[in-house]
């Protein structure tokens, strides 16, 4: 998702949104009408990421975009007709179309005019593993008195986001912690 964010940011940040085209009004959840109603004319302040969510921050609110399992964005500079799984377009003032394609429709588009960090799908997420909030002490505190195996514990997005199977296996190997060891039995120096 970070790679997608970095690829899209130069095309969106600082741009004014000319129009939104929603071809399929229901992805994982219904696309909120405010998304298409509030975004035209808005200026994109930033395209950020929180866990697997892209946060399209504008001067009118924030669109929360999730790729699901099969979603992707493409940047188009022509009037290419949409393909069968092209569900929505974000068209900028300079004529660039950012098109969302999702064959399985597990992706989602949400809208908030509040702080996106307070959104019910974002608020309970743990810290980013490379962020300042994620420390050995934090992980040790969150692991205390937990009988669940350490590997699924550190793969839980409410504990820390972005740790998948491979990263969990590698981190535990380097820390010399067996993956089935109870999370609460790992000593602080190992974290």
Residue spans for each PLM region:
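Generic hydrophobic-segment detector
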Residues: 4, 41-42, 152-154, 166
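Phosphate/anion-contacting hairpin/loop surfaces
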Residues: 63-161, 167-168, 172-174, 182-186
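Alpha-helical architecture
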Residues: 50, 162-163
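Gly/Gly-Pro- and Ser/Thr-rich, intrinsically disordered tail segments characteristic of DNA damage-repair
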Residues: 2-111, 116
